[in-house]
């Protein structure tokens, strides 16, 4: 259960029903939305971007951390909440309720990424569609982490009995052997 207020348009939602609603509104898989929120806010949903208590941005929420990047003058959380506080009717901003952030952020993901060809976690991070100028996330390991989280949402039976389609980019002029994984910073 959750003590978070997820009411919207006269209806009270829990997180599963909120994500189903957001998925229908955006054309984005509710599983994808759930894994993105877990990636951005943690499994227990304790991220500051959804606390509603950040000084100067009380009552604003940014479940998917859109517009959240660190600068010399502001943290990623503050920049994300600045974004959440702006007005944009298409994405239900300002995100001054949890549900407006969940639904509006999903609409943003759908319209800006999923429904225009960047329709895998990999393509959201590594933009091979535009090309190269339109990435969703800064964390290079996010696609790996999100795909692992998404896999855990399905039972072993479902995974064994469901046909999966993989979109795998093929790069030209690559070296014969793979580079070692980076370590540290």
Predicted regions and their residues:
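N-terminal export signals and maturation junctions of secreted/periplasmic proteins
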Residues: 1-16
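Extracytoplasmic/secreted envelope proteins and their assembly/folding machinery
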Residues: 16-20, 30-34, 99-106, 123
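Short, functionally critical alpha-helical segments immediately adjacent to catalytic or ligand/cofactor-binding
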Residues: 20-45
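Short, solvent-exposed loop/turn and secondary-structure capping segments
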Residues: 46-54
